[in-house]
Amino acid sequence: MITDPKMLELLVCPITGGTLSLNRKTQELISFKAKLAYPIRDGVPIMLASEARPLQHNEKRVHKK
């Protein structure tokens, strides 16, 4: 699990280069710019577009960085 805020600041979306937000509940890193959610498995962020899921229309910017 990514608990260090500085670690999160270093990670960027591989598609847009934009910032990511952590969703602790779903264990995902969210790129609102790309509208993708990257999974975190066993504490490791999987930053591959092929592994990301598209965000649903009802998923809003409620997650904190």
Swiss-Prot record:
It comes from Bartonella quintana (strain Toulouse) (Rochalimaea quintana). InterPro entries: Trm112-like. It comes from the Bacteria. GO terms for cellular component: cytosol. Belongs to the UPF0434 family. This is UPF0434 protein BQ10150. Signal peptide: none annotated. SUPFAM superfamilies: Trm112p-like.
